[in-house]
């Protein structure tokens, strides 16, 4: 018997000429990396690149929320010449969601899966959320570092006021619904 041979049974229905017994299939001309216990699957080296390419092509077609352009008025506010642009940026931050880019999640998750075989979904989600949180924290800290401290208080006040308005509107809607139910 040949060393490192795999015995494969071949039924008569598959081939016309079948030799009786098993046919040895040799592992000739297969290259393995040092320390590997089995040969790699066909195309495993280029699978990640292919998937990432296909996802990045489709990633530009993803529906995204419209975003406003960045305001560049912060340069004047440092010298005290103009304070209108940072206030506009502040109000934009308060009343509109912050969204800068639309990167497809699939490419991130695919690369996470290919890093290590044992990565589970909760681990991947934790990494994704922590990276989003740190990015948002960096944006807010960079925004507030350019503004004077009074503007920071104004931002907090506007956020609280906007939250109170939402609660007030919900209370009014609830009272209107109660009146309709009673009538």
Swiss-Prot record:
It is found in: Membrane. It comes from the Eukaryota. It is a single-pass membrane protein. Keywords: Membrane, Transmembrane, Transmembrane helix. GO terms for cellular component: membrane. Its main location: membrane. The chain crosses the membrane at residues 153-175. Partially overlaps RPP0. This is Putative uncharacterized protein YLR339C.
